[in-house]
């Protein structure tokens, strides 16, 4: 069956709905917002799907992400009288998705809209707020969608791709000239985004921690640890690109000038997401997916075994980042970002498959693995120390407060309240 997720377990509470692949997670957009795709062509005939269960499944899935900003891509092709939900169901669904769902939905792309969509929009217009309506973008074809999103990240059903090609063939007149892709240019010596960790090390006197990572972590540690929703909110796409250009050109960035504590957080996530290979490496992906099958008391030990296979450089950067995120989690009373919430944000920024994107069911082990690294930071990273890591922060240690000094010198932040309850191997 098209869209069937090979990693989906039959024990999934909504296996009867999830197996159709109607709703998929599709990585992040350019602003770091999680993308979901809803494909009408994967809706089975009415008699084969309980639409109340579909609604419950949608809420169950989105509930895991709606505290963060997110984007939805709706592929309309494939909706027919055989699988089309009733107007009553649509109206009830809109009411069921209350403010928490609508507030953090930042963009809704409707692909291949028809007159039916426009008619439905007129019907529901009295119920839809003007603010929500501004989030909707119509895309007549996939080419228009590519102007907004990186479609190579999306799980676009083959049926939708074929339909789009058919539309293009039916288009009258001269086809648009083929787009000429300029040859790739070598990165700048000061480039920070889209280059490998090795490149950054070579261009920065052997420093293991990439400059942009160090700068953003230092700023957030000093001024942003108690910011509510840290790493959950997005920032202006234009501002993010501007800051990226400044960093890539080797120019200084003063985040105080922007007045948005979420901006350095987005820059940090963007840096991780644009690495040519994920920080946890493609090779570790399948091992990480197996974390849920490991006995709970042995999971931290299993995490340490997986990390042993990482290149030294990746391990050093990961240890530095996880130590900081552990500090963030210790301020969760103020920032509302405990280790579980941070894991939901960072899971797909640390690891993704070499081909395609992670499925919805893969998010569970990926996020669990990330949560273990953050919550049990001391135990996971206690037996390995990347050579040279303790020497890079001398200046920062001299200028930092006692908590930061302890972390910089020992690699161990303040004792976690979670660790007092830890009874694992």
From Swiss-Prot:
<dbReference type="InterPro" id="IPR000198">
    <property type="entry name" value="RhoGAP_dom"/>
</dbReference>
<comment type="function">
    <text>GTPase activator for the Rho-type GTPases by converting them to an inactive GDP-bound state.</text>
</comment>
<dbReference type="GO" id="GO:0070374">
    <property type="term" value="P:positive regulation of ERK1 and ERK2 cascade"/>
</dbReference>
<protein>
    <recommendedName>
        <fullName>Rho GTPase-activating protein 8</fullName>
    </recommendedName>
</protein>
<dbReference type="InterPro" id="IPR008936">
    <property type="entry name" value="Rho_GTPase_activation_prot"/>
</dbReference>
<feature type="compositionally biased region" description="Pro residues">
    <location>
        <begin position="174"/>
        <end position="189"/>
    </location>
</feature>
<dbReference type="Pfam" id="PF00620">
    <property type="entry name" value="RhoGAP"/>
</dbReference>
<feature type="region of interest" description="Disordered">
    <location>
        <begin position="169"/>
        <end position="192"/>
    </location>
</feature>
<dbReference type="InterPro" id="IPR036865">
    <property type="entry name" value="CRAL-TRIO_dom_sf"/>
</dbReference>
<feature type="domain" description="CRAL-TRIO">
    <location>
        <begin position="13"/>
        <end position="168"/>
    </location>
</feature>
<keyword id="KW-0343">GTPase activation</keyword>
<dbReference type="Pfam" id="PF13716">
    <property type="entry name" value="CRAL_TRIO_2"/>
</dbReference>
<dbReference type="InterPro" id="IPR001251">
    <property type="entry name" value="CRAL-TRIO_dom"/>
</dbReference>
<feature type="site" description="Arginine finger; crucial for GTP hydrolysis by stabilizing the transition state">
    <location>
        <position position="232"/>
    </location>
</feature>
<feature type="domain" description="Rho-GAP">
    <location>
        <begin position="195"/>
        <end position="381"/>
    </location>
</feature>
<dbReference type="GO" id="GO:0007165">
    <property type="term" value="P:signal transduction"/>
</dbReference>
<dbReference type="GO" id="GO:0005096">
    <property type="term" value="F:GTPase activator activity"/>
</dbReference>
């Amino acid at each position: 069956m098209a869209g069937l997720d090979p990693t989906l377990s039959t024990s999934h509470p909504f296996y009867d709905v999830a197996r159709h692949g109607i709703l998929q997670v599709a990585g992040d957009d350019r602003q770091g917002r999680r993308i979901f795709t809803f494909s009408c062509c994967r809706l089975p005939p009415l008699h084969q799907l309980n639409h109340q269960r579909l609604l419950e499944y949608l809420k169950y899935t989105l509930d895991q992400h709606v505290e963060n900003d997110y984007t939805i891509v709706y592929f309309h092709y494939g909706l027919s009288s055989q699988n089309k939900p009733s107007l009553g169901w649509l109206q009830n669904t809109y009411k069921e998705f209350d403010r928490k769902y609508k507030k953090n939905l930042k963009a809704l792309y409707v692909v291949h809209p028809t007159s039916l969509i426009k008619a439905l929009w007129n019907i529901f217009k009295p119920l839809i707020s003007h603010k929500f309506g501004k989030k909707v973008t119509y895309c007549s074809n996939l080419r228009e969608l590519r102007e907004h999103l990186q479609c190579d990240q999306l799980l676009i059903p083959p049926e939708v791709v074929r339909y789009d090609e058919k539309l293009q063939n039916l288009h009258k007149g001269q086809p648009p000239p083929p787009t000429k892709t300029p040859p790739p240019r070598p990165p700048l010596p000061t480039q920070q985004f889209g280059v490998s960790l090795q490149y950054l090390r070579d261009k920065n006197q052997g420093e293991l921690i990439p400059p942009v990572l160090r700068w953003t972590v230092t700023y957030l540690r000093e001024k942003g640890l108690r910011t509510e929703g840290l790493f959950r909110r997005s920032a202006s796409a234009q501002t993010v690109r501007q800051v990226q250009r400044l960093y890539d050109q080797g120019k200084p960035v003063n985040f105080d000038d922007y007045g948005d504590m979420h901006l350095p957080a987005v820059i940090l996530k963007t840096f991780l997401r644009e690495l040519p290979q994920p920080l946890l490496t493609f090779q570790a992906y399948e091992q990480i997916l197996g974390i849920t099958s490991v006995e709970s008391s042995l999971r931290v030990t299993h995490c340490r075994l997986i990390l042993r296979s990482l290149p030294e450089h990746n391990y050093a950067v990961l240890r530095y980042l996880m130590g900081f995120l552990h500090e963030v989690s210790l301020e969760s009373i103020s920032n509302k970002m405990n280790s579980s919430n941070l894991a939901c944000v960072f899971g797909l920024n640390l690891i993704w498959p070499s081909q395609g994107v992670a499925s919805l069911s893969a998010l569970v082990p990926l996020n669990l693995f990330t949560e273990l690294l953050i919550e049990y930071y001391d135990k996971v990273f206690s037996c390995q120390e990347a050579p040279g890591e303790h020497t890079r922060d001398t200046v920062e240690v001299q200028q930092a407060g006692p908590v930061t000094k302890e972390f910089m010198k020992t690699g161990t932040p303040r004792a976690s309240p979670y660790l007092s309850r830890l009874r694992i191997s």
